[in-house]
Amino acid sequence: MTLITPSKWLADLTRQSFLKEYPVEVHYNTIDTSIFKPTPSDFRERYGLQNKIIVLGVANVWEDRKGLFDFYKLAQMLDDRYAIVLVGLSEKQIKDLPKNIKGIQRTNSPQELAAIYTAADVLVNPSVEETFGMTPVEAQACGTPSIVYEDTACEEVALQNGNTVVPQDVNALYEAITGYKFNGGGNK
């Protein structure tokens, strides 16, 4: 039996587990680049974010391990040039958001998600548990750079694509976000 993992990070963990006697191969997950590509939209206009630097977070289910509360902290730290947009929140989570975070439940299609990635200036993925992490790959395909935490598979994916990896600390995220040179104050 050969074990297949979606990242070297998970392969290394597997080799340290009770499964270590089995060979392990890495096969990266892929995305559909006919969908995840630069996709023009009216997203900025629809949400009144024309002159903002959009800091995007995307998750299927938002919880602490996905970095939701790091976005709450970032909302207190970033000035009004920035707009945090989170996709994938529940209705309750949206109701509980700080006023300076825009929450979106789900997208209606992968194409809509690609348009949001394209509209964003940077994707932030502060997850502390990822076996691969599709969002940085999808964002990159749409022309949007990513900032991810180290010590997860996201680090491996981000480094291969020239993105930014920071220690698992909200202050490091803040420094990376504010250190980016955005064209035109938020319009890519």
Language-model regions, residue ranges each:
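Nucleotide-activated donor-binding/catalytic signature segment of Leloir-type glycosyltransferases, i.e.
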Residues: 88-111
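A short helix/loop element that forms part of the nucleotide-sugar donor recognition site in Leloir-type
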Residues: 37-48
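Conserved donor-binding/catalytic core segment of Leloir-type glycosyltransferases
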Residues: 48-66, 72-76
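Short hydrophobic beta-strand element within catalytic cores of glycosyltransferases
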Residues: 145-148
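Short alpha-helical donor nucleotide-sugar binding micro-motif in glycosyltransferases
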Residues: 115-120
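Aromatic "clamp/platform" in nucleotide-sugar-dependent glycosyltransferases that forms part
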Residues: 128
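Conserved acidic donor-binding segment of nucleotide-sugar-dependent glycosyltransferases
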Residues: 163-170, 178-184
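Carbohydrate-associated surface elements
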Residues: 9, 30
